[in-house]
Design a protein with these regions (language model features):
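Alpha-helical substrate-recognition element adjacent to the catalytic core
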Residues: 1-117
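C-terminal cap/substrate-recognition subdomain and adjoining C-terminal extension
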Residues: 85-259
Length: 259
């Protein structure tokens, strides 16, 4: 009997990183420049704001890509309810490919609907549902899934799912500070972009909410535990699919892991 496919699936917002203010910056800069940013320009903006990326996530993605290279993982995917255009999730995906140095995500399952328009035809609901995911990704029902999300979705709890529920990652910098990083020697651009941001967005979304050293350490610890659970997932698969007789059933011991 062939082994079932193995996929690792990540939520996007507050799981891979904190991208709300990144969206504001992209919107404001594109308005100022009167053009769309290139992927390289988008990448440079994130590189100037490493706080937007969850601590430890690059190491986690490198590990999972390594498992895929060893043929122990068939696909790495994003399953998101983000209400932006599909191109937004694609830009985030391509940033991680740039950082890792190789394509990371094989497929993106986008939101059910955005602004009243159907985006992902094979989804049946805004809920994240195991059967919807399998259908959208065109996978067999035997697929083994490691699913990482900062929200507990009851209908993603399934015998085939190793569910890692993590603490949401938030990091907000004052937009004025972000613009100083992007245009360090051009105060006119800083002021014009800030003015556009103030005209378009609620004041609270432009304020900073920087973390204490203790909070930052908690985020690093969560990143280390996420990586440990990735190791545990693949170790469990080896025990389940190995040729030697199992001493216990990996699947029967599954439950949602809370971090």
């Amino acid at each position: 009997m062939p082994k079932p496919p193995v996929v690792v699936v990540f939520d996007m917002d507050e799981t891979l990183g904190s991208f709300g203010q990144l969206g504001i910056l992209k919107d404001v800069i594109e308005s100022y420049e009167d053009r769309h940013l290139t992927q390289d320009e988008f990448n440079r903006i994130i590189d100037k704001h490493p706080e937007f990326i969850r601590p430890g996530i690059l190491e986690i993605l490198e590990f999972v890509v390594g498992q895929r290279n060893k043929k122990l993982c068939d696909s790495i995917m994003i399953y998101t309810n983000n209400q932006g255009p599909r191109s937004w999730a694609q830009s985030i995906s391509e940033y991680f490919s740039y950082k890792i140095g190789t394509p990371v995500f094989d497929h993106i399952v986008a939101a059910f609907m955005v602004n009243g328009h159907r985006v992902e035809p094979s989804r049946t609901s805004h809920e994240k549902i195991y059967n919807d995911f399998i259908r959208c990704a065109r996978l067999p029902s035997t697929t083994e899934v490691c699913f990482v999300d900062d929200v507990e979705h009851p209908r993603m709890i399934h015998d085939n799912v190793y569910y890692v529920k993590i603490k949401p990652y938030h990091y907000r910098l004052p937009i004025s500070h972000c613009l100083e990083r992007i245009y360090p020697s051009d105060s006119d651009r800083q002021l014009e972009c800030l003015s556009r941001a103030q005209a378009r967005f609620h004041p609270n979304s432009l304020r900073g909410d920087e973390k204490t050293p203790e909070e930052q350490e908690v985020d690093k610890v969560i990143g280390r535990f996420m990586l440990k659970h990735m190791h545990d997932f693949f170790l469990g698969l080896k025990r389940t699919h190995g040729k030697t007789k199992r001493k216990y059933s990996y699947r029967s011991r599954r439950r949602t892991r809370h971090l």
